Amino acid sequence: MAKKSKQLRAALEKIDSTKAYSVEEAVALAKETNFAKFDATVEVAYNLNIDVKKADQQIRGAMVLPNGTGKTQRVLVFARGAKAEEAKEAGADFVGEDDLVQKINGGWLDFDVVIATPDMMAIVGRLGRVLGPRNLMPNPKTGTVTMDVAKAVEESKGGKITYRADKAGNVQTIIGKVSFDADKLVENFKAFNDVIAKAKPATAKGTYITNLVLTTTQGPGIKVDANSF
């Protein structure tokens, strides 16, 4: 613990806490200040000036990052018949119906993405208390309730991320791994920022992005200039 604290202090010394860095500078600093002994995740966190209590100011969706996430996603699909076979052929890790519901209710959660065909939502709905709090519940807005299960599986395996503003207007997501080339992280960051910018509600007033931070697993937060894109 003492060694980790020393490493964090050393990393913090390289960052000017009073400065908002450009995208390129922030990515370079994130790679430089990373001290994790594993391939750390690179994440971004936005604070948006929105009121999620208003229906027209709720921000939620999904996108495929240009260079993927670097993370191997374990995909679970609720489907039957031909659609179940499509999911398996597309590379889904787990495919089933009631058997998976029982397994999940028993405490099994070894998956990262849940996809379902519309006709399966009646049984998937029984998992709301388990999947909902973990942001795993299939939803049409994120493309995880669909008849095109093959496409959904392929996108999830190929770098698809989902995002959602919480009650305080915070949106967090992964944009890659520290091992990525800096230009690939920058490209992913810019692609996600474009999505957030376009999602600005017409009724939102004042400064839209009030705070933007880039960080790595265990690493310090680096403030990013939202106008540097």
From Swiss-Prot:
It comes from the Bacteria. Keywords: Repressor, Ribonucleoprotein, Ribosomal protein, RNA-binding, rRNA-binding, Translation regulation, tRNA-binding. PROSITE patterns: RIBOSOMAL_L1. InterPro entries: Ribosom_uL1_bac-type, Ribosomal_uL1, Ribosomal_uL1-like, Ribosomal_uL1/biogenesis, Ribosomal_uL1_3-a/b-sand, Ribosomal_uL1_CS. GO terms for biological process: regulation of translation; translation. GO terms for molecular function: rRNA binding; structural constituent of ribosome; tRNA binding. GO terms for cellular component: large ribosomal subunit. Belongs to the universal ribosomal protein uL1 family. HAMAP family: Ribosomal_uL1_B (MF_01318_B). Part of the 50S ribosomal subunit. PANTHER family: 54S RIBOSOMAL PROTEIN L1, MITOCHONDRIAL (PTHR36427), LARGE RIBOSOMAL SUBUNIT PROTEIN UL1M (PTHR36427:SF3). Binds directly to 23S rRNA. The L1 stalk is quite mobile in the ribosome, and is involved in E site tRNA release. Protein L1 is also a translational repressor protein, it controls the translation of the L11 operon by binding to its mRNA. This is Large ribosomal subunit protein uL1. The lineage of its organism: Bacteria, Bacillati, Bacillota, Bacilli, Lactobacillales.
